[in-house]
Amino acid sequence: MNKTSDEAVDDDPSVFHCTLELRTEGDWCRGLVRVDEDGRVLFDEWVGTRALIASLLGNTQEPVMTCSCTVPECAGFYDQESRVSENLVHWSLRYEGRDLDLLFDRNAYEDAALAILKHFRSHPWEDAEFGTVPYEYKEFEDFAKLVDNMLASSPRLAEKWNAPQIATRPAGGGS
């Protein structure tokens, strides 16, 4: 864990080259972490939107993988942090007693993370207990303001946000 370079040891069983995808089921939305090499789903869990935004802007020790109740330990995730380099986004975490390093191509990660945020931003929730709710927020406006501040602070992310390829339900998502 805590490797700092863009180079990963290919034969290290704790290092996974991954993709982040938006997964929707009806009104439910969560992140899906898929391992590229064989298409295996590593995690199909809630992705915390505060930490997702922080990971887009830089490094964070906020838990990215969590439970819908926002308690990462509830879903078995511990000691999480994310780091961003020029080409990679790197999540380090402990899951089921193993230290794992999840590496994402930065551009693909940004596109997927923005799609997840855009889904929430464009689908205000109606049911704060069961709908498409980022549970970290009491009011939709709090979430919307955080997204707007992120976009205002990063012209690059704002340009990607406004590009037509960032759809609210990209290919590879659920129904």
Stretch-by-stretch model annotation:
Residues 1-175:
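Intrinsically disordered, low-complexity acidic regions enriched in Pro/Ser/Thr
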